[in-house]
């Protein structure tokens, strides 16, 4: 529908493993990670080191497959994974607010604004056609 050339299965696999290196690095907040080019470059090197360490724990025959998933460089793939990650963060905010946790109000607004700025057609389609359903209660879904 969107004329893309990436393999959706590959994108999904990269998305599943994109945070796996955090078992070694921990989760660095996005504003810190991108505070300046030096920090961003240093963190990329740290993530690559963590990916190498993680891959080294696997049996030899599995390493090539997982190495590619942990170190994806195709911008079409990485842009889709980043968009999905941002969407997931937004949906987490929605769920927290539905549960009464008002600490997520500002994060929801900021994340939504960032999603609206994203030019990926598939993301925009999802937001237009499906996002409102996540705001509904179970009673409203039935």
Model-derived features with residue positions:
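Alpha-helical, largely C-terminal catalytic domains
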Residues: 1-142
């Amino acid at each position: 529908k969107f004329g893309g050339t990436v393999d959706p299965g590959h994108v999904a696999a990269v998305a599943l493993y994109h945070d796996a290196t955090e078992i070694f690095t921990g989760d660095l907040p996005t504003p810190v990670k991108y505070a300046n080019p030096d920090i961003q470059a240093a963190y990329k090197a740290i993530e690559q080191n963590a990916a190498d360490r993680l891959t080294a724990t696997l049996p030899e025959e599995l390493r090539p497959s997982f190495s590619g998933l942990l170190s994806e460089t195709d911008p079409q793939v990485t842009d889709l994974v980043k968009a999905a990650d941002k969407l997931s963060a937004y949906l987490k905010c929605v769920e927290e607010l539905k549960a009464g946790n008002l600490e997520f109000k500002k994060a929801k607004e900021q994340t939504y604004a960032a999603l609206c700025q994203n030019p990926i057609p598939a993301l925009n389609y999802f937001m237009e056609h499906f996002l409102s359903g996540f705001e509904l209660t179970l009673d409203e879904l039935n």
